[in-house]
Structure formats: structure tokens, C-alpha cells
């Protein structure tokens, strides 16, 4: 008699111990074959961290000797993230809540910045550092980025949901306005050099322009200086610097009272988006379908751009290199996607935003 054991921890695994060779098939809930293998003794698995109601079939010749479909209803599902960035932390909870409702399961979530969501998603159990969870039925550690896919597509792919933009709900702290004058929040730093706006004097020109329009400018970057070895990136002068690794409750407070946000593709841009603030996103490394939708995205499409999508299609270069540039590394065109975004391009989007806001009664009421 063959021994067949199932596990859905990390990914579906079928452990076989049989005298005869058996055929193991793993299908998704739609019946699509995900993997199959003939085996006497060992493990058949599908090392893809996605959640499905997996179907496991085992055949002895033509005869089906085992059939099991995972049903997630009332199951304990543990979703854990490791080394997750702020933007990803903000992106996922709304989709996880939709997954919980679709499959009627008990979801436990381990992620950074859980203090942003605990009250807004009371039916998800957020685990703290050191918390232990026993008797887990299903567990995954999702990939943050699915090769070639926009960021907003990753949660639906992993969680088997319809694709679409879901804006999360945030727990808001007690709010207090700290700047009486109208102001704009900016964030100039990012996790890699190639994500910066590298136009010479670009940020200085933006700050000067905003001040001419009557706005104060508040920089909410985590650091004054980002050290990339060969290059140090400084926050611009001429603005109010509320930098430093402050609690996110302070960043939420700053963003709540601002008129709009200007930044690169960073976690603070995602935080502003989650708070329904208009976002001017300056980005050459990504296309408009990669992050959240904003009518105020600034990209120069007359030069090489959107390389974040190239990087998963066999292009050269190491994404761990902060100076990564898959098309033009080591040439005069390196990072032209960022350098060739001019102040005038950014100014045009700022002007469009201000004009739009002045004609939007709902947005005015939200301030």
C-alpha cells in the first residue's frame, strides 16, 4: 500500500512512498495542470508561492488511486512577508482582505508596518515580531515582484483575484496641522540610484517654482544623505526638512494636510497614494502601468525608459547594483531615462494638477 502525504506549507508538496511507480499530478482549481511527475519514493512539489485550491491526483497506471482538492474555507492561512519594503506593505492588505472574503478563510498576516492596517482590517490577524502560529493549514511567502508584471498585478496573481487597482484603508493617527501655510510634500530619495530624478538642479527648480506659487515645501525623506559609495545623494535645499527615520504616523500627519505630493517611485509615494493625495510621480525606470495610476506621472518617452520591465527578460546587468542600467550601463546614455526628465516636464504636470484641483469641489473639501 502506497503512502501519500500532503502539505501546503510554502507550496503544494506530495510525499510518496510506494513499491510501484505512481504518476502525481497537481492542478489548480480551474483544472489546469501545474506539474506532474512519475515517482516511487520522494516529493513532488510546485515551488510557486501562490494560493490556489490545489487539486492533487495520483495514478497507478490508468487508475486514479488518490484524489484531493484543498478547500480554503475555514482553513488557517498564514501569509508572511520577509524584508518587505514600505510600498509593498501598503499595496498588499487590500488584496489580502479580498482573498479572505472570497475563500472565507482565517488569515494571519506577518508584515512590516502592520500598525497602518490593524484597525482598518479587523478580520485579518496581524502577527507581531516573535508571535508564533501553530496548526497552520496553508502558508506562503509571496514574491514581491512577478517577472515582467506591474506591481499592482502581483497580489492578484498570487491570491487568485481579478486584476485591478485596490487602494488600501489606513489607520489614521490623531492629526494636527503643523504648518499653517499651504504646503507640498516632496520625497527625493529611493532604494536605488537609478530610481532617482537625476536632472541637474531639477529639485531646486521645483522648489523655487512652488514657492513662487505660494506653497511651502516640506521634505519628508528618511535621510538627509543617501550614500551610494561613489555618489552621495542629498535632499535639496530651500525646503523645510522634516527628514529622519520618524514614525509613519508623523508621515501620515504631514501628508494629510499637504496639498499634493511630488516624488519618485518610492514607498512614500505609495503612502501618499493610499491617503488619496494627488501624486506627481517622476519616474524614468518604470512605465505608467507599473505603479498605481496617476494623471500626473512624468516620464520622457523620447529616450530609453521603462527598464524595470526589461530587467526580467534576460537583459544584462545586476539589479543589486545601485547604478543598474540594463540597456546603457557604462555609456554616456546610462540613466538617460531619469536625466532627460526636465523641470519643464515636471512643471507642466504640477500646473495641470493645480488647475484640476481648483475645479474639483470634492478635492477641495478633503483638504
PLM ranges: what are they?
Residues 1-367:
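Catalytic machinery of carbohydrate-active enzymes
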Amino acid at each position: 500500500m502506497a503512502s501519500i502525504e500532503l502539505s501546503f506549507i510554502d507550496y503544494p508538496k506530495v510525499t510518496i512512498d510506494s513499491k510501484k511507480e505512481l504518476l502525481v499530478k497537481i492542478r489548480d482549481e480551474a483544472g489546469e495542470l501545474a506539474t506532474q511527475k512519475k515517482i516511487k519514493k520522494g516529493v513532488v512539489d510546485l515551488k510557486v508561492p501562490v494560493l490556489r485550491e490545489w487539486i492533487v491526483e495520483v495514478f497507478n497506471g490508468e487508475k486514479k488511486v488518490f484524489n484531493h482538492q484543498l478547500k480554503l474555507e475555514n482553513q488557517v492561512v498564514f501569509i508572511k512577508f520577509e524584508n518587505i519594503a514600505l510600498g509593498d506593505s501598503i499595496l498588499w492588505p487590500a488584496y489580502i482582505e479580498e482573498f479572505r472574503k472570497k475563500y472565507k478563510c482565517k488569515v494571519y498576516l506577518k508584515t512590516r508596518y502592520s500598525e497602518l492596517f490593524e484597525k482598518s482590517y479587523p478580520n485579518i490577524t496581524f502577527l507581531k515580531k516573535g508571535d508564533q502560529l501553530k496548526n497552520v493549514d496553508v502558508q506562503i511567502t509571496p514574491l514581491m515582484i512577478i517577472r515582467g508584471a506591474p506591481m499592482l498585478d502581483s497580489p492578484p496573481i498570487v491570491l487568485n483575484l481579478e486584476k485591478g487597482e485596490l487602494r488600501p484603508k489606513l489607520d489614521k493617527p490623531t492629526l494636527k496641522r503643523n504648518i499653517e501655510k499651504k504646503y507640498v510634500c516632496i520625497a527625493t530619495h529611493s532604494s536605488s540610484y537609478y530610481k532617482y530624478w537625476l536632472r541637474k538642479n531639477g529639485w531646486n527648480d521645483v522648489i523655487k517654482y512652488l514657492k513662487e506659487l505660494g506653497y511651502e515645501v516640506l521634505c519628508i525623506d528618511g535621510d538627509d544623505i543617501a550614500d551610494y559609495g561613489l555618489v552621495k545623494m542629498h535632499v535639496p535645499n530651500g525646503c523645510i526638512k522634516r527628514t529622519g527615520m520618524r514614525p509613519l504616523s508623523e508621515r501620515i500627519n504631514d501628508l494629510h494636510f499637504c496639498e499634493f505630493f511630488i516624488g519618485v517611485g518610492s514607498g512614500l509615494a505609495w503612502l501618499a497614494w493610499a491617503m488619496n493625495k494627488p501624486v506627481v510621480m517622476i519616474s524614468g525606470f518604470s512605465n505608467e502601468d507599473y505603479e498605481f495610476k496617476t494623471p500626473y506621472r512624468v516620464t520622457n518617452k523620447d529616450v530609453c525608459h521603462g527598464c524595470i520591465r526589461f530587467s526580467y527578460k534576460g537583459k544584462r546587468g545586476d539589479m543589486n547594483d545601485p547604478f543598474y542600467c540594463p540597456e546603457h550601463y557604462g555609456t554616456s546614455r546610462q540613466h538617460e531615462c531619469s536625466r532627460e526628465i526636465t523641470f519643464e516636464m515636471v512643471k507642466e504636470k504640477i500646473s495641470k494638477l493645480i488647475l484640476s484641483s481648483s475645479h474639483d469641489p470634492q478635492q477641495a473639501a478633503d483638504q
